[in-house]
Curated annotation (Swiss-Prot):
HAMAP family: RNApol_bact_RpoC1. GO terms for cellular component: chloroplast; DNA-directed RNA polymerase complex; mitochondrion. This is DNA-directed RNA polymerase subunit beta'. The lineage of its organism: Eukaryota, Sar, Stramenopiles, Ochrophyta, Bacillariophyta. It catalyses: RNA(n) + a ribonucleoside 5'-triphosphate = RNA(n+1) + diphosphate. The gene is rpoC1. Keywords: Chloroplast, DNA-directed RNA polymerase, Magnesium, Metal-binding, Nucleotidyltransferase, Plastid, Transcription, Transferase, Zinc. Zn(2+) binds at C70, C72, C85, C88. Its EC number is 2.7.7.6. It comes from Phaeodactylum tricornutum (strain CCAP 1055/1). Mg(2+) binds at D540, D542, D544. It holds the Pfam family RNA_pol_Rpb1_2. The keyword Iron-sulfur does not apply. Gene3D superfamilies: 1.10.40.90, 2.40.40.20, RNA polymerase II, clamp domain (4.10.860.120), RNA polymerase Rpb1, domain 3 (1.10.274.100). Its cofactor is Mg(2+); Zn(2+).
Length: 696
């Protein structure tokens, strides 16, 4: 087997074309036969317990169940590897190919992708400009504006609101077309005529659809000639009609047209803003309507640009070829007693194949259109359930009333394929533990449990023991570590001093979800985390767990120090604002530390030469945290306006008393010393800030 090591920079997920799905699943055998289409809903034979041919576990499509052994048993040797059995058509290869070989179902009737027709916003409706998408920008409504600017004569009636809205676009409901739900038969054909007229008007250069108010839609059952219904073929209703309209979209010209339309909306809003500000409900309503039109146009242009950027066609939202994932990813396991446990996906695929084959038989016998439409709707619902169970309508249940697990359920969520199996999988040189707060840590530090550090850094400890001559080989070094000898601790501290670690908290929603720290050994089994970095990780201390990863190469360690340390990730990449900000108990602690006006405390009215003397007295319990004290200041002028009193001493010097200041001067008014009144807590806060900024 040839292993390929192709390098790549990123993975792009986009719409798959029917041709690409066939490339995944369709294979040509040496005898010229094509295999890959799953035609039967059977899984395994109930007598032989072997996969049924052309079924969901077919060995001809997905590969042999047993390595180098065909289905009929004719070939069972390694020397036949690569041979295709002429009797059963199975290729003799490894059974592991059943993990990546795909199949496909050729749908008789195209179906819509449930993610795009039942999403918010509705992508198909935005692209086709139907349902709630307004196509009219009416800024020439002059019936009342010239006579009465504030529109006092205009009364709010149903007909007025109908005139202001383009009601025609609301006729076309894509869900009604796809699921055959409507009041009258003509609604199934509405998109064919309305969009045709709309597209023709745009090709002629019109910016709006109807430039005059359109009457309220009525039931068209009695006003439509019967021959028009008979002239429209049945394959032009439902999903095929939506597919045809999506194929007709010229993406680049639509982008140009929408950009021009957005500019028109913006100019209208800027030009008529004074009128909107002065007017009453009518003009206010018109302003909100234009805002909504512009917002819808912006959403549409984003979808169009994404389609152009990925090289996708909007018609690929309609499925004609349905891929079948490999059987090893949806296994069927035999239990004790002869029963089988199977994945829910097999039941969902079985429903689709059964309904697809039944629809084919109904079309072959020319069944009534009512029955065929019902079968098409059932096929659409079966595909919806496979892709996303419960996205639209009732949730499909299994035999024991348990919701069936669809493809979306396998991918999304905490226990989905991405978060649990890819982002959260176990790797070497990593560990996991609960986090607790470590307020005494520096911002670039974290507390690493001793047991975890011994296990994670074991290779580095062994190398250091051998380099220092404390162990002659790896086996002796491992024995020293297992016996927890005292010589291990200084070696471990030396290793940790120059080796950073990564901390990661799932889900990693942005790049700040993984940051580097310098580890500090702590007792216990919990990781200590600085409280200021919690906002970047979106972490709290109610039982959250974090993963520890060890950078092995010198390049990775250099990247830790240069890019990924917590102090270097001060700003949020989303908006550029600081993401490391004090909150909760830190703010409360700062407030409590600086509270004053508490009288009668220990050490009040004492005088100190500097901040260090205050810290020393507080550490010796000579002061309380809120004691009012006096601290000498450097020679700097402080403007105090209200002089309370002046005292002249025996040496002819004087002391001026202000509200929070005492200044001693000579008889010539030269400054000798000055003291400012504060509290012990404020002195401590000031000392910490000055020491951090290297002012002390």
């Amino acid at each position: 087997m040839v292993e390929s090591t192709k390098e790549f920079d990123y993975i792009k997920i986009k719409l798959a074309s029917p041709f690409r799905i066939l490339q995944w699943a369709n294979r040509k055998l040496p005898n010229g036969q094509f295999v890959g289409e799953v035609q039967k809903s059977e899984t395994i034979n109930y007598r032989t317990f072997k996969p049924e041919m052309d079924g969901l576990f077919c060995e001809r499509i997905f590969g042999p169940s047993k390595s180098l052994e065909c289905a009929c048993g004719k070939y069972k040797r390694v020397r036949y590897e690569g041979l295709i059995c002429e009797r059963c058509g199975v290729e003799l290869t490894e059974s592991r190919v059943r993990r990546h070989r795909m199949g496909y179902i050729n749908l008789i009737y195209p179906v819509t992708h449930v993610w795009y027709i039942n999403s918010r916003p509705n992508f198909m409706a935005l692209l086709l400009e139907v349902e709630e998408f307004e196509k009219k920008l009416d800024t020439t409504y002059t019936t009342h504006s010239e006579n009465c600017k504030k529109c006092d004569g205009l009364k709010l009636t149903t007909s007025t609101v109908v005139d202001l809205w383009d009601e025609r676009v609301k006729r076309i409901k894509l869900a009604s077309l796809a699921y055959f739900i409507a009041e009258d038969e003509i609604s199934f054909y509405g998109i064919h005529w309305d969009l045709q007229q709309y597209r023709r008007s745009r090709e002629l250069g019109y910016t709006g659809y109807p430039l005059k108010p359109y009457p309220k839609p009525q039931n068209r059952r009695y006003s439509t000639p019967k021959y028009l219904l008979r002239a429209t073929p049945n394959f032009l209703i439902g999903a095929p009609l939506i597919k045809r309209e999506l194929e007709k979209l010229n993406l680049k010209s639509e982008i140009f047209r929408m950009r021009y339309f957005i500019l028109v909306c913006t100019k209208v809003l800027n030009k008529e803003k004074p009128i909107y500000d002065e007017s009453r409900w009518f003009r206010k309503w018109e302003q909100q309507r234009i805002y909504k039109i512009r917002e819808q146009a912006i959403k549409r242009i984003r979808i169009l640009e994404n389609l152009v950027g990925t090289g996708s066609s909007p018609a690929w939202m309609i499925l004609t070829i349905l891929p079948v994932i490999p059987p090893a990813l949806r296994p069927m396991i035999q239990l004790e007693g002869g029963r089988f446990a199977t994945s829910d996906l097999n039941e969902l695929y079985r429903r689709i194949i059964t309904r697809n084959n039944r629809l084919l038989r109904l079309l072959e016998i020319d069944a009534p259109q009512l029955i065929i439409r019902n079968e098409k709707r059932l096929l659409q619902e079966a595909v919806d359930t496979l892709i996303d169970n419960g996205k639209r309508g009732k949730i499909a249940l299994s035999a024991n009333n348990r919701p069936l697990k669809s493809l979306s359920d396998i991918i999304k969520g905490k226990h989905g394929r991405f978060r649990q199996n890819l982002l959260g999988k176990r790797v070497d040189y990593s560990g996991r533990s609960v986090i607790v707060v470590g307020p005494s840590l520096r911002l670039n530090q974290c507390g690493l449990p001793y047991e975890m550090a011994i296990e994670l850094f074991q290779p580095f400890i062994i190398r250091e023991l051998i380099n220092q001559g404390l162990a002659s080989n790896m086996k002796i070094a491992k024995n020293l570590i297992q016996q927890n000898e005292s010589i291990i601790d200084p070696v471990l501290e030396k290793v940790l001093k120059s080796h950073p670690i990564f901390l990661n908290r799932a889900p990693t929603l942005h790049r700040l979800g993984i940051q580097a720290f310098e580890p500090i050994l702590v007792q216990g089994r919990a990781i200590k985390l600085h409280p200021l970095v919690c906002s970047a990780f979106n972490a709290d201390f109610d039982g959250d767990q974090m993963a520890v990863h060890i950078p092995l190469s010198l390049e990775a360690q250099a990247e830790c120090y240069m890019l990924m340390l917590a102090p270097y990730n001060f700003l949020s990449p989303a908006n550029g604002e600081p993401i490391i900000m004090p909150s909760q108990d830190m703010v409360l602690g700062c407030y409590y530390l600086t509270v004053n006006n508490i009288n009668g405390l220990l050490g009040s009215s004492h005088y100190f030469a500097n901040l260090a003397d205050v810290i020393l007295a507080y550490s010796q319990s000579k002061l309380e945290i809120h004691s009012a004290i006096w601290i000498r200041l450097e020679e700097q002028e402080i403007n105090e306006s209200i002089l309370l009193k002046t005292t002249i001493l025996d040496d002819e010097t004087k002391i001026e008393f202000y509200e929070n200041l005492q200044i001693r001067k000579t008889k010539d008014n030269q400054l000798i010393v000055q003291y400012v009144q504060t509290t012990t807590g404020r002195a401590i806060l000031n000392y910490i800030i000055q020491k951090t900024l290297n002012f002390l």
